[in-house]
A protein has these predicted regions:
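N-terminal cofactor/phosphate-binding cores enriched in small/glycine residues
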Residues: 6-91
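Active-site diphosphate/adenylate-binding microenvironment
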Residues: 11-22, 29-33, 37-42, 342-423
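Glycine-rich, acidic loop regions that bind phosphate or pyrophosphate groups
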Residues: 104-152, 240-343, 445-446, 468
Length: 596
């Protein structure tokens, strides 16, 4: 018979990943919902197959094979009570840490509980039967395929992690009758490694290497040195934002470069290898702008975190040990990639346009004036985004609540930190919604004079009015319910003033650049004062949106400035055309479209 693989994407991906992870032994029990899988397996000579009618016996046979070979074994059966006969053998495997992958075929899970024949609920499994269980739905779209690939990779890796043990995949199949697919799809195998597999560690690929750091505890001196040495040895760059906690020699704040909406750079943003450490990042610009061909994740939790959809290896180990392992004992100092990034960043900063009074403008005035040794906390999302555009002093540490990424506790987190070191200044920058959500916290009796809070008050959630956000298409109507405008005194000039002063705060405010310049020195005074300070800045929502958009188009802005100036001195657009002619206009445009 001229039969090959089933024309089902889920089945094809599963087979391809079994082969990629070198899992070849299979015990198959008869059935219909697992038929497309079994028929595909038996069509591929890679797989070493055995048949067993009794699923209970099949599970115990798998225990014997796994124990004898020290290698994983697949068992597969159909739905209904066939799968109920696996748990006794899988329980044996669980307590002996035997690597058995149980694949149960199933109809669509929407049929569960609706009196369909041979459909039972396998969504809840006893704790000591398998280490991990996942449901794989039928795969239709590329996004489905990505998720199927990811979940199967997770399942296969759980066979081996932390001593290993049995794993369950509940596979939705389609009763397909087409078995004419003669090749398997290309898949991305994800391999989880730890100290026990150090001999299997891959070599660093050739090409450009970047370390991407999400939110992270402040780096210890030892970790900083390990990262610095690694970057120096491999001409790598450490891409960070204001929550990354790394202040070493190879730090690169890429937020301004990454946010340029019209920029056309060469390959500075293309990484042949991205080493991902830390947790959730608020640097949306770098997240979206970077091209990562290959990602390695380094974390002591060993979990698969495929944020960039390019993950191939997970290293379950300390970051220090990882960077030391991949750093040779002797190396030459290399900074070419870092200098290339810095040069381009400096070129964009030289083009930054004048912007209105706003969170971004305030950040541009204060980022380099924060006192040495101080600490600053940001609210999400507009505040952290605005301040990420600037390079804080290396001895000023910064944080934001990007774990849960809510606006509800930023002030409290900043205050909690301030309780620990009364001799250090703690700054906070929060939008009005974030501050008022958490405003009760500043009445806590432990609040000290080392606290400085800035409230950017534009009377609404600015995020929903920025040009890139869906909410912005509603204009002012967004304020009704989308952006929650008009609450908390509707930008009252006295509400927060009275509240803060009654709690013992020194209150200052500004509604424009001139007022700001007259009072900001009080806010960044490097000396401890007799009372905490609250600085309220009243901004306009359109100014906020326009300021951010201008900075995100700084690379374009210089071109527009030149064009407008040339038009002005030429006496108008038509006069310029008359002077230059068609060829001159074309040449002029070519020059202006060039990028640094």
């Amino acid at each position: 018979m001229n039969k090959f693989y089933a024309n089902e994407r889920s089945v094809l991906i599963l087979l391809a990943l079994l082969k990629a992870h070198n899992i070849k032994r299979v015990i198959a029990s008869p059935g219909t919902t697992n038929l497309s899988l079994v028929a595909s397996l038996q069509s591929d000579p890679f797989f070493e197959m055995y048949s067993c009618v009794d699923e209970r016996s099949a599970a115990y046979m798998a225990c014997g094979i796994a124990a004898e070979t020290g290698e994983p074994v697949v068992i597969t059966c159909t739905g209904a009570t066939a799968s109920r006969n696996y748990p006794s053998g899988l329980t044996e495997a669980y307590y002996r840490k035997l690597q058995i992958l149980a694949i149960t075929g199933t109809q669509d899970e929407t049929k569960i509980g609706h009196l369909h024949a041979q459909v039972i609920d396998r969504s809840v499994i006893p704790n000591d039967v398998v280490r991990y269980s996942t449901h794989i739905r039928a795969t239709y779209t590329d996004e489905d395929a990505y998720y199927t690939e990811l979940k199967i990779n997770q399942a296969i890796n759980e066979l081996f992690r932390h001593g290993g043990g049995p794993v369950h995949i509940n596979l939705h199949t389609l009763y397909i009758r087409d078995f004419h697919v003669n090749s398997l799809p290309a898949v991305r195998a994800i391999h989880c490694l730890d100290y026990t597999k150090i001999d299997s560690f891959p070599k660093l690929p050739k090409g450009r290497i970047g370390v991407f750091v999400g939110s992270h505890a402040t780096f210890t001196p030892e970790l900083t040195m390990a990262v610095d040495n690694f970057c120096s040895a491999h001409d790598a760059v450490c891409f960070c934002d204001n929550t990354s906690g790394y202040y070493g020699k190879y730090r690169m704040n890429y937020a301004l470069l990454g946010s340029q909406e019209k920029a056309e750079y060469t390959n500075i943003n293309v990484l042949d290898l991205c080493i991902h450490i830390g947790e959730i990042s608020a640097d949306y610009a770098t997240l979206g702008n970077m091209v990562r061909k290959n990602v390695w994740r380094v974390s002591e939790d060993g979990e698969i975190r495929d944020q960039f959809k390019k993950l191939t290896y997970v290293f379950e180990m300390s970051e220090i040990d990882f960077f030391k392992y991949y750093t040779p004992d002797e190396f030459d100092l290399k900074r070419d990639y870092l200098m290339e990034c810095q040069k381009l960043d400096e070129a964009i900063r030289a083009r930054l346009p004048e912007i209105p009074f706003s969170n971004v403008w305030i950040a541009s005035q204060l980022y380099d004036k924060l006192p040495s040794g101080s600490e600053i906390h940001f609210g999400v999302l507009n505040s952290i985004r605005s301040w990420n555009l600037f390079n804080l002093p290396r001895d000023v540490h910064s944080f934001a609540n990007v774990g849960g990424f809510g606006i509800d506790g930023g002030v409290s987190s900043m205050l909690g930190a301030s309780f620990i070191n009364h001799n250090r200044l703690y700054f906070g920058v929060f939008g009005d919604l974030a501050f008022f959500y958490d405003m009760n916290s500043i009445g806590n009796r432990h609040v000290g004079s080392n606290v400085r809070i800035m409230v950017i008050n534009n009377g609404r959630g600015q995020e929903f009015r920025n040009h890139y956000h869906t909410g912005s298409i509603f204009g002012k109507d967004a304020d009704k319910y989308i952006a929650a405008g008009g609450h908390f005194g509707n930008m009252s000039k006295t509400l927060l003033k009275d509240y803060a002063e009654n709690l013992g705060f020194t209150y200052i405010s500004a509604s424009d650049k001139e007022e700001f310049k007259n009072v900001y020195a009080t806010f960044v005074n490097p000396n401890l004062t007799d009372s905490p300070i609250l600085f309220e800045c009243f901004t306009d929502t359109d100014d906020e949106a326009n300021a951010l958009k201008a900075y995100w188009n700084a690379d374009k802005d210089i071109k527009n400035t030149i064009i407008n100036k040339v038009i002005e001195v030429s006496g108008g657009k038509q006069a310029l055309r008359n002077v230059l002619g068609p060829r001159g206009i074309k040449f002029f445009r070519t020059i202006l479209n060039k990028r640094t």
